[in-house]
Amino acid sequence: MMDFLKQLPHIEPYGNPQYFLYVIAAILPIFIGLFFKKRFAWYEILVSLFFIVTMLTGGKTNQLAALGLYLIWQIVLVLFYKQYRKGRDGKWTFYLVSLLSLLPIIFVKVQPAINGTQSLLGFVGISYLTFRSVGIIIELRDGVIKDLKMWEYLRFLLFMPTFSSGPIDRFKRFNENYKTIPERDELLDMLAESVRYIMWGFLYKFILAHILGEILLPPLKNLALQTGG
């Protein structure tokens, strides 16, 4: 299994135009399903997992292993606190569980400053997953979340479009939006808005970046070297 994962290509999120072609091809069936008021839940899971796995692999599986350990850790904490909140509401228990939820990212951020090496617990997206994990613990304590199903919890954490770049979201809002399929007119408006954002992203990341980095910057760099700057 590990050899198979190592052979998977590394697909950097938003790194090149090819990535967008993969995304469009993958989400087209999802959009068609929503257009006809259908959700292909298992297909959505497979799409998210495919992009997350290829985001974290590419000859190495250390980030994928770190994600697996992270998920196990957070699941144990959430299950414990969910059960605990059914009968009690101690503030120190809440503080402790929140701190334990933050522990992986604390190690990831502190270790390089201590010994100059990257933590084995680090992976792309750990910051956003930590915001979501702690947010769920807070919502459990506040009573915003009354019933937390593990399937919904993992779907929230591993939602591919916001895995590596956000934005930060709340479980309750995310879950309500997921269960509500937009009307066709609204869906088409959302599609048009998405296309507009993608075009702006292409303009900034690929066209302007190429003009500035490949056309304008080299002559300015040479001029600075010639003048001793």
Regions found by a protein language model. Name each.
Residues 2-229:
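Membrane-embedded transmembrane alpha-helical bundles that form the catalytic cores
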